[in-house]
């Protein structure tokens, strides 16, 4: 048994404009090469674009998109007796949120469009409506977990 005390969980900081932790989580995933101001600019312009297009609260659209994409289960590779099984495991809400943000940004990067602002805003609006590549990724993960339910006892 370890003698060290358990590390305290870091609380996520909130962003300067909306004072929202979720926005900060998305910004930190957009971030490339330490250019945080650029990441903030991309997300804030995408949020402004969502507000112009939908005339709804853009943060509620962001929240709904992340909620729709968040998976309940995922599959992990587990090696048993020389063969590898994809074992379905439940995931916590924070890990699910992280996966959802990662999938949303990955889907928006693959999208065709002018720039990241438009691609991200359209992907978020699609996910909030219930379609888009990020939603497809979640459904694919759930299908994989359902197909490998027989291996759930290997957890």
From Swiss-Prot:
Pfam families xref list: Ribosomal_S7 (PF00177)
Major site of localization recorded for this protein: plastid
Cross-referenced Gene3D superfamilies: Ribosomal protein S7 domain (1.10.455.10)
SUPFAM superfamilies: Ribosomal protein S7 (SSF47973)
GO biological process: translation
Keyword Glycoprotein included in the entry's annotation: no
Subcellular location: Plastid, Chloroplast
InterPro entries recorded: Ribosomal_uS7, Ribosomal_uS7_bac/org-type, Ribosomal_uS7_CS, Ribosomal_uS7_dom, Ribosomal_uS7_dom_sf
Gene Ontology cellular-component terms listed: chloroplast; small ribosomal subunit
CDD domains given in the database record: uS7_Chloroplast (cd14871)
GO MF annotations, alphabetized: rRNA binding; structural constituent of ribosome
Keywords: Chloroplast, Plastid, Ribonucleoprotein, Ribosomal protein, RNA-binding, rRNA-binding
Taxonomy, superkingdom: Eukaryota
Keyword Plastid: yes
Transmembrane domains' residue ranges: none
Family: Belongs to the universal ribosomal protein uS7 family.
Subunit structure: Part of the 30S ribosomal subunit.
PANTHER family according to UniProt: RIBOSOMAL PROTEIN S7
Role description: One of the primary rRNA binding proteins, it binds directly to 16S rRNA where it nucleates assembly of the head domain of the 30S subunit.
UniProt-recorded name of the protein: Small ribosomal subunit protein uS7c
Originating species: Pinus koraiensis
Gene giving rise to this polypeptide: rps7
């Amino acid at each position: 048994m370890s003698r060290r005390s358990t590390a305290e969980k870091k609380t996520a900081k909130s962003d300067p404009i909306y004072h929202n932790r979720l926005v900060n989580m998305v910004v930190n995933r957009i971030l490339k090469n330490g250019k945080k101001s650029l990441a903030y600019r991309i997300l804030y312009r995408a949020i402004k674009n969502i507000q112009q297009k939908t005339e709804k609260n853009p943060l509620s659209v962001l929240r709904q998109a992340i909620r729709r994409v968040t998976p309940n289960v995922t599959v992990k590779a587990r090696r048993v007796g020389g063969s590898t099984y994809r074992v379905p495991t439940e995931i916590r809400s924070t890990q699910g949120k992280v996966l959802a943000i990662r999938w949303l940004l990955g889907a928006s990067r693959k999208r065709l469009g002018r720039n990241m602002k438009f691609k991200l805003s359209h992907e978020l609006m699609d996910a909030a409506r219930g379609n888009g590549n990020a939603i497809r990724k979640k459904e694919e993960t759930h299908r994989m977990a359902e197909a490998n339910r027989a291996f759930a006892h290997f957890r």
